[in-house]
Amino acid sequence: MSRARAISLSLVIAVAVVLAVPVGGQNAAGDPAAVAFMRQINQVLRGSSLHIAVEQVEFFTVGQGRPANRIHQGGIRWVANDPRRFADGEKITYLVDKSDGATASGLTSAQTEAAIDSALGTWQASPPMKKVTIVKRADGGDDPDIFDSFFGFGGFGNPFLADIVEAGWLPRAFFEAVGGPGGGRGILAFSVSFIFTDDDGNPTDINGDNYLDTALNEVYYNDTFGNAATDRANNPWRINLPLPAIDVETVALHENGHSLGLGHFGPPPAAVMNPVYAGIRHAPLPTDAAGMSALWSSWPK
């Protein structure tokens, strides 16, 4: 039995307490309500043997009344050869959860997976990532994510099947729960990053680079868009189609930029990592590349 499975029953009981604490409010950097809720989740995680904590959640939005900021508590980075994340040497691994890959707008799991693969391939091919090998791990059918379980939208899975997990398309209510009122209408997707903690629950920096150690990352996509029963029916998830459609690869490129360590920046709409969706963008711009270079330049060859 995996260490995640071994503690899942006790976590289910504890999660019920966490769910009684609403997110609410504007989830901007340092927002008291958002940070307090993250602390509630982290209290549950602290009672487990995983030695991880939620550190930041970063939204990609359509720019209509929703915060385009991150829930953010500190700088984090991946650590090469970190045995705690079952690291594949100096590689970064990712997994696409096929079970939630189809969309209400009619895309199949195979279509969305191919778009996500293309997005990760774009980052891999960018010059700043030349020292890094991004490896895809096969979906073996196990539940590979945990963040959704804190809101009642899935079981507590095994979070160490890959460094980055593409958790799939979830319903509007999940994004309302995470992003507060209006989140289900305005948030296209978000990336949630976990860090490692020591036996006392304190963040770790095992390589002394003055950044907290990234443990894992999960990406969630909003299935409201293109759902005929919602007010976002006219903004369907599509493959390589312009607005008002939402291009899967563009959103995946942005969110996996977060997964690899980038924050929101760049003059809108001229950067992949701008926080508001502005149509198809499949190639990083100089601001994106500069940020990625700063993150990965010290990665061992």
Predicted regions and their residues:
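Bacterial N-terminal signal peptides that target proteins for export
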Residues: M1-L11
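Stable alpha-helical elements in mature extracytoplasmic
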Residues: F37, I41, T108, T112-A119, ...
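Metzincin-family zinc-dependent endopeptidase catalytic domain
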Residues: E113-V251
